[in-house]
């Protein structure tokens, strides 16, 4: 009988962070197996140690290919990509070896997705420190995956049931935001948001709101001119392309309306403008998904949590949500391909 559940590659993340234990907790939830076939890309010994930590009733089944998985609750299918000495790993203390391993998990997942052998990847957290120890030139998942897939433009969306936010600028100092904003970048982010909501979220006519930058949306230029000179023209240009978009709106009122389903996504000018309201609502179950990639990639919206790693107390809610979203997007994009 044909199994239509998408195969979701779950990258283990930093071995000395909370990734391994939240994977065990997530795969201990029978519901995960109703929406997908989860395949761990990581280290067999580390995952066995995490299973022991959580006292989970779970067997480990290794396979060299996604086709060899069993995909049934109570069995963790894993493609073993490293052979770390699990007994000697110190929680919160990355090494060049753990850094290289976590990069291998990511690149293997990307390659499998690009080859169509899995339908999506859901990534567990990593750190810039571990990547640097491994000699990587990249600072995080997004840059690494964009480079691996030869993708020139990507954007970060934080998504939950009540709110979705997409960022124009991401990890830059607040004092540099205004200088970095331009009409082309804002237009590209709006366009990418619209296309993703259609193709990966199944929203045929997405409603997009755009946040202003300054207090009260600049108050007709009294508190800043970015709304008049940069943001509003980008919104008008997006509208002329047939995108249902409005704004710029003062952020202090915008997010109330967005969280009450008046918009399908909000395009934000900088990191904290979007993430503060998002995490107020979706602190435990938010998902980070990368827009613009030729593959589906979702991720937890938290870090490695070195301070609580390997204590068995980490909350798996965000990973479960990321797996569910990856499965949903895989199902929607698969249907889109069939209908074309």
UniProtKB/Swiss-Prot annotation:
Compartments (UniProt record): Cytoplasm
A Gene Ontology term for the protein's cellular component: cytoplasm
Enzyme's top EC category: oxidoreductase
The UniProt record lists the keyword Transport: no
Binding site for substrate: 141-142, 279, 288, 297
Pathway(s) this gene product operates in, as recorded in its UniProt entry: Cofactor biosynthesis; pyridoxine 5'-phosphate biosynthesis; pyridoxine 5'-phosphate from D-erythrose 4-phosphate: step 4/5
Signal sequence coordinates: none
EC number of the protein: 1.1.1.262
Necessary cofactors: Zn(2+); Mg(2+); Co(2+)
Residues the record lists as binding a divalent metal cation: 171, 216, 271
Catalytic activity: 4-(phosphooxy)-L-threonine + NAD(+) = 3-amino-2-oxopropyl phosphate + CO2 + NADH
Cofactor: how and how many bound: Binds 1 divalent metal cation per subunit. Can use ions such as Zn(2+), Mg(2+) or Co(2+).
One function term, GO molecular function aspect: NAD binding
UniProt keywords, alphabetically: Cobalt, Cytoplasm, Magnesium, Metal-binding, NAD, NADP, Oxidoreductase, Pyridoxine biosynthesis, Zinc
Annotated function: Catalyzes the NAD(P)-dependent oxidation of 4-(phosphooxy)-L-threonine (HTP) into 2-amino-3-oxo-4-(phosphooxy)butyric acid which spontaneously decarboxylates to form 3-amino-2-oxopropyl phosphate (AHAP).
Remarks, miscellaneous: The active site is located at the dimer interface.
Family: Belongs to the PdxA family.
Name of the molecule in the record: 4-hydroxythreonine-4-phosphate dehydrogenase
Originating organism: Desulforapulum autotrophicum (strain ATCC 43914 / DSM 3382 / VKM B-1955 / HRM2) (Desulfobacterium autotrophicum)
């Amino acid at each position: 009988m044909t199994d239509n559940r998408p195969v979701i590659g779950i990258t283990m993340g930093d071995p000395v962070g909370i990734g391994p234990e939240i994977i065990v907790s997530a795969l201990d939830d029978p519901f995960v197996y109703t929406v997908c076939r989860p395949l761990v890309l990581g280290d067999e010994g580390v995952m066995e140690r995490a299973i022991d930590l959580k006292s989970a009733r779970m067997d480990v089944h290794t396979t060299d290919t996604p086709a060899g998985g069993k995909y049934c609750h109570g069995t963790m299918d894993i493609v073993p990509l490293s052979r770390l000495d699990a007994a000697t790993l110190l929680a919160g203390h990355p090494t060049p070896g753990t850094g290289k391993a976590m990069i291998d998990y990511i690149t293997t997942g990307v390659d499998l997705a690009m080859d169509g052998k899995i339908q999506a990847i859901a990534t567990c957290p990593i750190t810039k420190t571990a990547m640097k120890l491994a000699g990587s030139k990249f600072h995080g998942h997004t840059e690494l995956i964009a480079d691996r897939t030869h993708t020139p433009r990507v954007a970060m969306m934080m998504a939950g049931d009540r709110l979705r936010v997409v960022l124009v600028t991401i990890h830059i100092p607040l004092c540099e935001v205004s200088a970095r904003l331009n009409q082309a970048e804002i237009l590209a982010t709006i366009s990418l948001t619209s296309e993703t909501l259609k193709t990966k979220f199944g929203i045929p006519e997405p409603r997009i709101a755009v946040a202003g930058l300054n207090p009260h949306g600049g108050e007709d230029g009294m508190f800043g001119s970015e709304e008049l000179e940069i943001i509003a023209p980008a919104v008008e240009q997006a509208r002329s392309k047939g995108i249902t978009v409005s704004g710029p709106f003062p952020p202090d009122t915008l997010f109330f309306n967005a969280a009450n389903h008046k918009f399908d996504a909000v395009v934000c000018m900088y990191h904290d403008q979007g993430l503060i309201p998002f995490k107020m609502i979706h602190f435990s179950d938010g998902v980070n998904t990368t827009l613009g990639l030729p593959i589906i990639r979702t991720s937890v919206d938290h870090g490695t949590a070195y301070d609580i790693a390997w204590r068995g107390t980490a909350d798996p809610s965000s990973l479960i949500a990321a797996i569910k979203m990856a499965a949903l997007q895989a199902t929607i994009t698969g249907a889109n391909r069939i209908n074309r």
